[in-house]
Amino acid sequence: MSEMTPREIVSELNKHIIGQDNAKRSVAIALRNRWRRMQLDEELRHEVTPKNILMIGPTGVGKTEIARRLAKLANAPFIKVEATKFTEVGYVGKEVDSIIRDLTDAAVKMVRVQAIEKNRYRAEELAEERILDVLIPPAKNNWGQAEQQQEPSAARQTFRKKLREGQLDDKEIEINLAAAPMGVEIMAPPGMEEMTSQLQSIFQNLGGQKQKPRKLKIKDAMKLLVEEEAAKLVNPEELKQDAIDAVEQHGIVFIDEIDKICKRGETSGPDVSREGVQRDLLPLVEGCTVSTKHGMVKTDHILFIASGAFQVAKPSDLIPELQGRLPIRVELQALTTSDFERILTEPNASVTVQYKALMATEGVNIEFTDSGIKRIAEAAWQVNETTENIGARRLHTVLERLMEEISYNASDLHGQNITIDAEYVSKHLDALVADEDLSRFIL
């Protein structure tokens, strides 16, 4: 679990997301409160429930990007889902309980990686011994059994030194490795994923753990043996319990497009993929117990962050019970021309940096001037205003159009320097931006 302070979390988010300070502060405080809760005594800790967040803002302003970056910072079980993928219980489609099952699967994977990393040093030692046994087979007694030697032989020590120094990396050896489990692919209707995964695990375990001889270079064999030995050192039952604890205490669920499941107008009959989904989400957000293949998971202390553009619907269109369970409201602002300029230059891997790196692979040096970046930002903002406002995503469309000619001819431009200034941008984009019909279909 992350021990970063809210200020550190916001600082880290600032490297990738421009503006939206209120949203960053809210998620940073929510993440820090997870850590604060774990410092309390057990009785009080049980009473402190997370304050779920509802992020409201137009498309392309950074809602989903905040979730993506938060997943990397949290160091906790995290899952992002689309609200539109679910239907009410009893109808064809995914049930909302599958959110917790997927979160638990993600936690098991995360905890397994951590456990393997923790045991890596011991696994490397065991893998080393297995390779040395192939290079220098141990002496055998009269019954054909390997004898236990008190001290490793001088030859074994010499080979161990060479192995650690990488002198034997390209030598080929034959070694027994665990055979890959039998691959069984089962297609099932939506909502029955749990059953298919259980059937797959049954079929895969039918053959037992078989060893298969393989010829490999020592450096490749070492990697596979380390993974195999590390997996043996991990206790599967402990791992499952640790994963369930991590989900219950630190789990975070990000539900995107929640505005798409708001009821629109007066409709008759059941609304299985809108209001029905909201009703099914209630027990998860409030706190219930969900059955997963790894065990029972309580959702009382899982943090839920919901987001939506709410361009057609309003937050008040959500059913009142769900509104009450999302007490923290954060409004993200539409992006301005100056925001677009900052998006093009400030993030660690901004779009302009990506294009420069891509063209550099062909030996073409691209330089974006300040005037060029300003003109690109103005063009993107202008197209957003005259057509659909898709936020920062418009920059990708505009830049792709701007760079099309260079990208196409890059292999013939090796060694050239190209400067993209205001004049270059105007020459390639002005006609499209000015013609509303063209920009509607091309940009």
From Swiss-Prot:
ATPase subunit of a proteasome-like degradation complex; this subunit has chaperone activity. The binding of ATP and its subsequent hydrolysis by HslU are essential for unfolding of protein substrates subsequently hydrolyzed by HslV. HslU recognizes the N-terminal part of its protein substrates and unfolds these before they are guided to HslV for hydrolysis. SUPFAM superfamilies: P-loop containing nucleoside triphosphate hydrolases. GO terms for molecular function: ATP binding; ATP hydrolysis activity; peptidase activity; proteasome-activating activity. Pfam families: AAA, AAA_2. SMART domains: AAA (SM00382), ClpB_D2-small (SM01086). Induction: By heat shock. GO terms for biological process: protein unfolding; proteolysis involved in protein catabolic process. A double ring-shaped homohexamer of HslV is capped on each side by a ring-shaped HslU homohexamer. The assembly of the HslU/HslV complex is dependent on binding of ATP. This is ATP-dependent protease ATPase subunit HslU. It comes from Salmonella typhi.
